Design a protein with these regions (language model features):
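A short, aliphatic-rich alpha-helical micro-motif
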Residues: 103, 169, 187-188
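Segments forming glycine/polar-rich beta-alpha architectures that bind adenosine-containing cofactors
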Residues: 59-101, 124-127
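C-terminal amphipathic helix plus adjacent low-complexity
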Residues: 5-64, 93-96, 105, 226-304
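Catalytic donor nucleotide-activated moiety binding site of glycosyltransferases and closely related
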Residues: 135-177
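Conserved nucleotide-sugar donor-interacting segment of glycosyltransferase catalytic cores
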Residues: 1
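A short acidic (Asp/Glu
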Residues: 120-124, 159-163, 205-207, 223-225
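Active-site donor-nucleotide binding/catalytic segment of nucleotide-sugar enzymes
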Residues: 103-132, 137, 146, 152-155, ...
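A donor-sugar binding/catalytic signature common to diverse glycosyltransferases
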Residues: 179-226
């Protein structure tokens, strides 16, 4: 979630009024249900790869014939190889990945990778979105008893090359996370989380963990348990700082973030019931256009 005037003002307000005697026991983090549903539907079988390849080629051929194909877009059937590479990529991570309990004598830092290319990086964090450079910076500044654990995005298998993964494994204090482990498990096990714009930064606040943030416009950057950095030296200083944060500050961050999200947002209690309902698009369009028209009347005509 990016910054907004409402969220910034709200976080500053709740940080100021936080009482150390205030309870945060009722503040719970619930995993976004759509993520669980979508990730459970991922099918990386050979049959599915062939099926998607045929569909993709036919669909792109149809766009070319109809003249819908964009200039300077992806090359024809350019995504097809990724459908097959993801099968090998998952086997690679299961072979070389480690479990949460594999490093009992070491501390860990978790960095969940983003899906790339993706708008959450290219548009929301245009200043810095180089995951490999982040990994190099963090790994060079960690204490000798700490391992940087990299967790792949479920939708990115097949997009990053085997050579990319090989380069990660050549870094002495970097390990890959097994596919059967969750981000939540690694956050709870780690001393802090590395994030650019992903949800792992927010999850860490709810799980009372510090965050090393590389996303300039992250709203969590305003919290006392988060350090925003943009270069190697800031990374070094922030890591030292994050490892010395007082435990009471974590409650303050959780309280301020949760209260701000609740005050600036709104609930959609039945949104999962209509998640895949295309027939709602027209109705939502009418509602939104009606609201926009009403606001126009009030703002521009009502002031006359």
């Amino acid at each position: 979630m990016v910054q907004s005037d409402c969220l910034i003002a709200s976080i500053q307000k709740y940080l100021d009024i936080f009482d150390h005697d205030a309870t945060v026991d009722d503040i719970k983090y619930n995993t976004y249900e759509h993520f669980n549903i979508a990730s459970s539907k991922i099918n990386d079988s050979l049959f599915n790869a062939i099926k998607h390849s045929v569909y993709t080629c036919l669909h792109e051929l149809y766009k070319i014939i109809k003249g819908f194909n964009k200039l300077n877009s992806y090359k024809f059937c350019g995504w097809v190889p990724t459908f097959f590479r993801k099968i090998r990529a998952k086997k690679y991570w299961m072979k070389y990945g480690i479990g949460v309990d594999s490093l009992s004598d070491m501390k860990t830092v978790i960095f969940p990778l983003h899906m790339e290319p993706e708008i959450s990086l290219l548009q929301i964090s245009p200043e810095f979105n180089n995951s490999y450079e982040i990994i190099c910076w963090v790994s060079k500044n960690l204490p000798a008893d700490t391992i940087l654990v990299i967790k792949e995005n479920p939708w990115s298998f097949g997009i990053r090359s085997k050579n990319y993964y090989d380069r990660l494994r050549k870094i002495g204090n970097v390990e890959l996370a097994r596919l059967d482990t969750t981000t939540e498990e690694w956050i709870n096990r780690s001393i802090f989380t590395v994030a650019i714009t992903g949800t792992s930064g927010y999850e860490s606040i709810y799980f009372n963990k510090p965050v090393l943030s590389y996303g300039k416009y992250q709203i969590i950057n305003y919290l006392p348990t988060v350090r925003y950095v943009a270069n190697f030296f800031e990374t070094r200083d922030a890591i030292k700082d994050l490892m010395c944060i007082n435990n009471n500050v974590f409650l303050k961050s959780k309280y301020a973030l949760h209260k701000s999200l609740m005050s600036c947002g709104f609930s959609l209690p039945r949104h999962l019931d209509y998640l895949d309902a295309d027939y709602l698009v027209g109705d939502l369009g009418k509602i939104l256009s009606g609201n926009l028209y009403d606001q126009y009347l009030v703002k521009f005509l009502g002031s006359r």
